[in-house]
């Protein structure tokens, strides 16, 4: 029977120990609780059976019961309370619980008085939790064990109790905070790892980098606004990519200005509340900073993946600019929808955390699971998909360069474009990979950093100290500075893509109050030059009919060049004006299925001519020019064209046109 009593007495402690799973020192200590003085025993142990890690905390928890004890509602009430809040200390590993009959007598005699004072009977004190017996507390055998410890019994024994939230870091239960897997607790502010001077330096460093990134991305976006038709697919995603990181850098700059006013809760000295990290969505300013920062961080990465997709479509299946642009709605749905969904999920899970280094709010700063699933996993997925598509596109372009003969000019432009893609991708991938590496390092060593912090602050906070600490380490500030630097600098490569002489000319024209009409793009538009595939697949000995681009920067006109057709015409002795009209007329010839060439209708010419040029044509000029063309010159030109070798006239996409630069190209 005695053995059964001991086993049953130890069972609640076993459950309690398995629940808290942490660290501290087990030792007998004198009872300092005023309510538990003058009892048959005078030593207790902490933490007690109600999860109070010191007698000061236990005394605060016992205060509501003082009126009942002072009014002496029951002679069993005070021994019963002390059995739970300050149990008798015996040999290590042995705990005695009060009997159920003792609990029932105390409850029946004091419950009405407790209702009068508005004090509920705690759930931890339910009588059904205690062994079914009827003996006083403590028993005589317990007093003997407490007064005569066994030989060799340890005076102080280490026991694993886990992290106990200090009173200064306690948070209202309604807010749903959590710190080190302890509910209603929050990390301290300022940062738990760094000194104030280190935090001040880090804040100014982040502010400076955010200004640089904001300036670069804003310049890219404004360059796009000056000439919105200049950047078409496949390079249009660079603009949205720049906009995303412009917003990211703006939020970090706002965090620099706010310091820790949003990322941290203010201290309340009257309630012994220290400044703690903001968590959850109750702080509207912190929630807004988190939504913008996380949304545009993820959206920027998705836009980079879309950029690699558009390059892949242009390089491998030879999609043209118009064909890629038809998928723009799908691109926007993915780029804004995926980050939006992740942001909503995090808001619903209440995973927002204040960053007391940068002053912003983000996710995964203290919650390792949120860091893994909502930061590391998406970023790694974006890198894998983007790099795969990028390599496939570069390999395809390189195969074209090696296997198919190109003119030297086109070879140089293709190589230049491949170099630009490679440099831009490296400038994006290297910072992003460094950020991912910092996150992996942080989540791997965070447990050691937290244990070190508890070891250094446990006596100050009066909480259990760590047990059997084998490794102690503090994070280096350079790790966090590198993470913030690379997270911001990843948006700067966009300015190198738009940086060119043409950009300088456009800004100069903008500041002087005039706009150039439209200038032909240079090497970065190589994927959009006319009849690229045709030049790759044609016979090297076959002559090419060059095609006029008009004023378009994308080279989408399908008119035959008047200069080339004039070279074919045998009427070179005609006057300059007649020669020009003949060439213009031949530029509108179309070849029918039987091999003959027929003139286009004027309606077809009107549809092909640029809109600005069409307004200058009058009916008189059109009819007068056609009237001066004699029949001999027309038939002679048609005959000469028929006798020439096969001439390729195609209506290719921006990937399937010849790369030819006119003499007037910018």
UniProtKB/Swiss-Prot annotation:
Spans traversing the lipid bilayer: 206-226, 238-258, 289-309, 329-349, 375-395, 421-441, 478-498
Glycosites: 42, 265, 356
Record's keyword terms, sorted: Cell membrane, Developmental protein, Disulfide bond, G-protein coupled receptor, Glycoprotein, Membrane, Neurogenesis, Receptor, Signal, Transducer, Transmembrane, Transmembrane helix, Ubl conjugation, Wnt signaling pathway
Pfam families, A to Z: Frizzled (PF01534), Fz (PF01392)
Post-translational modification: Ubiquitinated by ZNRF3, leading to its degradation by the proteasome.
Keyword Signal attached: yes
Main location group: membrane
Motif Lys-Thr-X-X-X-Trp motif, mediates interaction with the PDZ domain of Dvl family members: chain residues: 502-507
Any single GO CC term annotated in Swiss-Prot or TrEMBL for this entry: axon
UniProt record, GO biological process: canonical Wnt signaling pathway; cell proliferation in midbrain; commissural neuron axon guidance; dopaminergic neuron axon guidance; establishment of planar polarity; hair follicle development; inner ear morphogenesis; midbrain morphogenesis
Membrane topology: Multi-pass membrane protein
Chain residue ranges for the region called Disordered: 538-666
Residues of the FZ domain: 23-136
Stretches assigned to the Extracellular side: 23-205, 259-288, 350-374, 442-477
Signal peptide extent: 1-22
Cellular localization per UniProt: Membrane; Cell membrane; Cell surface; Apical cell membrane
Topological domain spans for side Cytoplasmic: 227-237, 310-328, 396-420, 499-666
Organism domain of life: Eukaryota
Family: Belongs to the G-protein coupled receptor Fz/Smo family.
Cited PANTHER family: FRIZZLED (PTHR11309), FRIZZLED-3 (PTHR11309:SF22)
Role, per record: Receptor for Wnt proteins. Most of frizzled receptors are coupled to the beta-catenin canonical signaling pathway, which leads to the activation of disheveled proteins, inhibition of GSK-3 kinase, nuclear accumulation of beta-catenin and activation of Wnt target genes. A second signaling pathway involving PKC and calcium fluxes has been seen for some family members, but it is not yet clear if it represents a distinct pathway or if it can be integrated in the canonical pathway, as PKC seems to be required for Wnt-mediated inactivation of GSK-3 kinase.
Complex formation: Interacts with VANGL2.
Protein name per the record: Frizzled-3
UniProt source species: Homo sapiens
């Amino acid at each position: 029977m005695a053995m059964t009593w001991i086993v049953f007495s130890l069972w609640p402690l076993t459950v309690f120990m398995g629940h808290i799973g942490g660290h501290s020192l087990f030792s007998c200590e004198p009872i300092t609780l005023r309510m538990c003085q003058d009892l048959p025993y005078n030593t207790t142990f902490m933490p007690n059976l109600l999860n109070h890690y010191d007698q000061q905390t236990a005394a605060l928890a016992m205060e509501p019961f003082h009126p009942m004890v002072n009014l002496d509602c029951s002679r069993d009430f005070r021994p019963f309370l002390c059995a739970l809040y300050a149990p008798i200390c015996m040999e290590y590993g042995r705990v005695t619980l009060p009997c159920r009959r003792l609990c029932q007598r105390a409850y029946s005699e004091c419950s009405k008085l407790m209702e009068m004072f508005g004090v509920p009977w705690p759930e931890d004190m339910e009588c059904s939790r205690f062994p079914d017996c009827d003996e006083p507390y403590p028993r005589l055998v317990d007093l003997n064990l407490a007064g005569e410890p066994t030989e060799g019994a340890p005076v102080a024994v280490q026991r694993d109790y886990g992290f106990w939230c200090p009173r200064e870091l306690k948070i209202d239960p309604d807010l749903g905070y959590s710190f080190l897997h302890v509910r209603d607790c929050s990390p301290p502010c300022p940062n738990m790892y760094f000194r104030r001077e280190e935090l001040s330096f880090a804040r100014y460093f982040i502010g400076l980098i955010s200004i640089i990134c904001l300036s670069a991305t804003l310049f890219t976006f404004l360059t796009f606004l000056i000439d919105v038709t200049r950047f078409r697919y496949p390079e249009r995603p660079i603009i949205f990519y720049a906009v995303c990181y412009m917003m990211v850098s703006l939020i970090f700059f706002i965090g620099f200005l706010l310091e820790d006013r949003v990322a941290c809760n203010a201290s309340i000295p009257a309630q012994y509340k220290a400044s703690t990290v903001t968590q959850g969505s109750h702080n509207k300013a912190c929630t807004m900073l988190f939504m913008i920062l996380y949304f545009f961080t993820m959206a920027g990465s998705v836009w980079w993946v879309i950029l690699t997709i558009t390059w892949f479509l242009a390089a491998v299946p030879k999609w043209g600019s118009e064909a890629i642009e038809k998928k723009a709605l799908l691109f926007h749905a993915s780029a804004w929808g995926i980050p939006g969904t992740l942001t909503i999920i995090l808001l619903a899970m209440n995973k927002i955390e204040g960053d007391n280094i940068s002053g912003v709010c983000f996710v995964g700063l203290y919650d390792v699971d949120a860091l893994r699933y909502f930061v590391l996993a998406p970023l790694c997925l974006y890198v894998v998909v983007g790099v795969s598509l990028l390599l496939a596109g570069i390999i395809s372009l390189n195969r074209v360069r090696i296997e198919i003969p190109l003119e030297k000019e086109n070879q140089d432009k293709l190589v230049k474009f491949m170099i630009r893609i490679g440099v831009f991708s490296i400038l994006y991938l290297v910072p992003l990979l460094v950020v991912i590496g910092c996150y992996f390092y942080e989540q791997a060593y965070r447990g050691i950093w937290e244990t070190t912090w508890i070891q250094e602050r446990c006596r100050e906070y009066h909480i259990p100290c760590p047990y059997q600490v084998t490794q102690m380490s503090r994070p280096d500030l350079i790790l966090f500075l590198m993470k913030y630097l690379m997270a911001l600098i990843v948006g700067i490569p966009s300015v190198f893509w738009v940086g060119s002489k043409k950009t300088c000319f456009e800004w100069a024209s903008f500041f002087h109050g005039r706009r150039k009409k439209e200038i032909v793009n240079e090497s970065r538009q190589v994927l959009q030059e006319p009849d690229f595939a045709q030049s790759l697949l044609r016979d090297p000995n076959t002559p090419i009919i060059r095609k006029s681009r008009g004023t378009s920067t994308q080279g989408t006109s399908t008119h035959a060049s008047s200069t080339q057709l004039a070279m074919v015409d045998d009427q070179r002795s005609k006057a300059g004006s007649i020669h020009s009209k003949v060439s213009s007329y031949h530029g509108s010839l179309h070849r029918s299925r039987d091999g003959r060439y027929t003139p286009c209708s004027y309606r077809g010419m009107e549809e092909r001519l640029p809109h600005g040029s069409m307004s200058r044509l009058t009916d008189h000029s059109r009819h007068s020019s056609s009237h001066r063309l004699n029949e001999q010159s027309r038939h002679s030109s048609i005959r000469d064209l028929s006798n020439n070798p096969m001439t390729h006239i195609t209506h290719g996409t921006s990937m399937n046109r010849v790369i030819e630069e006119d003499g007037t190209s910018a």
